[in-house]
Design a protein with these regions (language model features):
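Cytochrome P450
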Residues: 1-411
């Protein structure tokens, strides 16, 4: 990969300063050579306008098998990237294969199915808030562990018929492990093996005992002679929708609460009714997207960037959503600030084009229910530690917080 006399910017593998690093990358240009963990090079795209363009450009693929020489030479196998680009589902499919797989999964995320979950999301939210209310007044509690994480986890597991108990805890642990971009090949391999064992067991159970859940729907689609997907595509699709279906919502909730508690003037606006909760959700998605960067895409042909470098055929591209969300060239001088009254709410947190996240309406619905309910129950909610002591989830992919200690004062 060549760029005019410039060494690649080395991405922090532990993501200790996601937004500081995003600002530094933006200062280097709309597309910058970067080095990811393991010495993998990719063009980090930080410009909102350029990223939006590339997300719909036919010269950009998500299929490493067809369009990435490093994968074709078997130089990536076993790395932390394996679970991100080594899968065979909508996430890595290109062209006709992507359309086929998206058509199969789309019925699982219709507006009707999402709307049907609303009463259940409300009930789960109420139960979790009741549990929090039993916590000793004024004592710190980790909101991520007790509310932000269990809500979307329970919702997605019920949608897909995932059994209660230890298996759900194991699923959560494995998804967190996949997000770890510091994993060794041995750790990545162990995580992948455990994930597929868990999902294979779920598929076997639904074949034997089909039910009114989305796993059963996908199993039926896979076994239908007219709409076949391979068994590996089925497992990888489940990994995509179950993993993405809860982890991103966990961080959406956490980032929204964190933003409001560190911007009390904004919290006052929404609690007074001057600004709707929908605006809080969209500004959170722009200001602190759950996915800070998402590996990888690949140039199918040379792509000349106006007033910038040329991304050569076969080179990797890293969409940098955290950087694009705060791009001052698109959002103006106040791009780095959290402002729920912002005129321009557009963001790319759920992607764009044919790879736009199918689960976006579900994530928004969960946040629309959970956030006002949380602040209605605990209007005096406050951080239990200084904001600067909050630690990121870890890795450069996730844009969330490892924990969110709060005090649940009622007024």
């Amino acid at each position: 990969m060549a760029q005019q006399g410039q060494q690649p910017y080395v991405i922090d593998p532990v993501g200790s300063d996601i937004h500081g690093e995003a600002a530094r990358l933006r200062a280097l240009g709309p597309a910058t050579r970067t080095e990811l963990p393991g010495g993998i090079e990719a063009w980090s795209v930080t410009s909102h306008t350029l990223l939006k363009q590339l997300l719909t450009d036919d010269r950009v693929s998500k299929n490493p098998r067809e369009h990435w020489p490093l994968w074709q030479r078997d130089e990536i196998r076993g790395s932390w990237l394996q679970s991100w680009i080594g899968v065979t589902n909508m996430f890595t499919a290109y062209g006709a294969d992507h359309r086929r797989l998206r058509k199969l999964i789309a019925p699982a995320f219709t507006a009707r199915r999402t709307d049907a979950m609303l009463p259940r999301v409300e009930a789960i939210t109420t139960a979790l808030l009741d549990d929090l209310a039993a916590h000793p007044a004024g004592e710190p509690v980790d909101l991520r562990a007790r509310f932000n994480h269990p809500l979307p986890m329970q919702v997605i597991c019920e949608l897909f018929g995932f059994p209660e108990g230890e298996q759900r805890a194991e699923l959560a642990r494995l998804v967190a492990a996949i997000m770890d971009t510091t994993a060794t090949p041995e750790q990545a391999g162990a995580t992948a093996a455990a994930v597929y064992a868990l999902l294979s067991g779920l598929v076997a159970d639904k074949r034997e005992h089909p039910a009114d859940d989305l796993t059963s729907l996908l199993v039926a689609a896979r076994d239908d002679e007219g709409q076949r997907m391979t068994e590996q595509e089925l497992l990888d699709t489940l990994l995509l929708v179950i993993g993405a279906g809860h982890e991103t919502t966990v961080d959406l909730l956490g980032n929204a609460v964190h933003a409001l508690l560190t911007h009390p003037e904004q919290l006052k606006l929404v609690l007074s009714g001057e600004v709707p909760w929908n605006d809080v959700i969209e500004e959170t998605l722009r200001w602190a997207p759950s996915i800070a960067a998402l590996p990888l895409r690949f140039a199918v042909a040379d792509i000349e960037i106006p007033d910038g470098p040329t991304i050569r055929k076969g080179e990797a591209i890293l969409p940098a959503y955290a950087a694009a969300g705060r791009d001052p060239a698109f959002h103006g001088e106040t791009a780095d600030g959290f402002d729920i009254r912002r005129d321009r709410q557009e963001h790319l947190a759920f992607g764009h084009g044919v790879h736009h996240c199918l689960g976006a309406p579900l994530a928004r619905m969960e946040a629309r229910i959970a956030l006002p309910a949380l602040f209605a129950r605990f209007p005096g909610l406050q951080l239990a530690v200084p904001a600067e002591e909050l630690e990121p989830t870890g890795g450069f992919i996730s844009g969330g917080l490892h924990s969110l200690p709060v005090r649940l004062t009622s007024g």
